[in-house]
Amino acid sequence: MKKILVVDDEKNITTLLRAFLEDTGRYQVRTENSGEAGYQTALQFHPDLILLDVMMGDLNGDGLADRIKNDPLLRKTPIVFLTGIVTKKEVEENDGVIGGYPYIAKPILVLRELLDCIEANIRKSG
């Protein structure tokens, strides 16, 4: 079973994503509602992939991604950003990658797209 960490400051989003991903029977999911808590959980949980909100209060997604990529224990962990600051069209025009990271635009309207993105990025990482 693959491990996924969801970090988003909106509790309703983490709750929804956790329920959806766990219901597939393929993922063990942990959630956090702040960047700092997400980093600490990543160190302990060793996720196979991190779903990460871009805009958060204490430590935004870019800052957390930088910390993860500079940490020897976590640097190979794939990150997929969840964001409401780009449109689905912008994500598609950039082949789902902006700033070097794959993105999923919120709201996530087609959950199958999320699963496909998760699986593709876990496969890429090894």
Label each residue range with its predicted role.
Residues 63, 86-120:
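Alpha4 helix (beta4-alpha4-beta5 surface) of REC/receiver domains from two-component response regulators
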Residues 46-48, 73-78:
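His-Asp phosphorelay/catalytic-motif detector in bacterial-type signaling
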Residues 7-8, 32, 50:
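Conserved sequence signature across two-component system core domains
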Residues 57-58, 66, 75, 87:
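The feature encodes the CheY-like receiver
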Residues 11-30:
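Two-component/phosphorelay signaling modules centered on CheY-like receiver
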Residues 45-51, 56:
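Active-site beta3 strand of CheY-like receiver
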Residues 31-40, 61:
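Helix N-cap/capping motif at the beta->alpha junctions
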